[in-house]
Amino acid sequence: METEVFHLSETNPDVRITAYLAGTYERIPHNEKRPAILIFPGGGYAYCSSREAEPIAHEFIAHGYNAFVFDYSVNGAAVYPTQLIEASLAMKFLRDNAEKLRIDPERIFTIGFSAGGHLAAMLGTMWHKNFIYDAIDMPYGYNKPTGMILCYPVITSGKYTHRGSFDTLLGDGKNDKKLLREVSLEYAVTKKTVPTFIWHTRADKTVPVINSILFAEALSKKNIPYELHIYPDGWHGMTLCREFLDAENEYIGDWVRCAEHWMKNTK
């Protein structure tokens, strides 16, 4: 496996992609061009969680993907829509460098955890917004993922919100009702939203499961393909459900197998 770091911002060195690339071997020719997964760690927009970064990359490398961890602006370094523009820039980077990175530019999925799930969902619902193309010179749809995986995502700024995520994302605009609705993603779903895989635990006390339910309901209303898994027990931030990360839970950890199957069948 090869790793390499690519910096995407001239003003913020913390905005970067860490690439995890499978080696190329004569007897494994498919490694020369793998599907890709772009990973958005959580952390309430205050930091990027290491538990939702490299371990996720290693997991998906083992399942046949080349993986890319995306560190975006956090902790007040920027406010919305900067993170969405950065995510679009990350997608552009992968497609611009698909040959070098040994990935299929038509098979790039995103995965986000908690607040990283919010960013992934913003990209998956708002990739077509004009302000993104005003900021980045690229063809229409160049930043559009093939599909998105949302793991215990922050979605709503309403009654069931994770308030801290929105406070940090919006900064001085945190009480602006128009902005709050704009980033409350159950309202952002349109016919242009990408196919979605979601998982959450019913017992999550940090980001209530209603976040995922509201998003799934919005997807249903627009007839967007999706798969939703709600596990009865467990807590926020279970990632891969492995003991070395937090706690072993084979049942919930099966989400990885389910997501892999979903990706293989998503066009």
Residues of each region from the PLM?
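Primarily recognizes the serine-hydrolase "nucleophile elbow" in alpha/beta-hydrolase
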Residues: K92-R163, L180
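Acidic catalytic loop of the alpha/beta-hydrolase fold
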Residues: S157, A203-V207
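Short beta-strand/loop motif that positions the catalytic acidic residue
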Residues: K192, I198-H200, D204
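Short amphipathic alpha-helix adjacent to the substrate-entry channel of hydrolases
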Residues: S50-F68
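Catalytic nucleophile-loop/oxyanion-hole region of alpha/beta-hydrolase
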Residues: C48-S50, F68-P105, A247-Y251
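N-terminal cap/lid segment of alpha/beta-hydrolase-fold proteins
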Residues: M1-E32, R163
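Short beta-strand element of the alpha/beta-hydrolase
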Residues: K33-G42
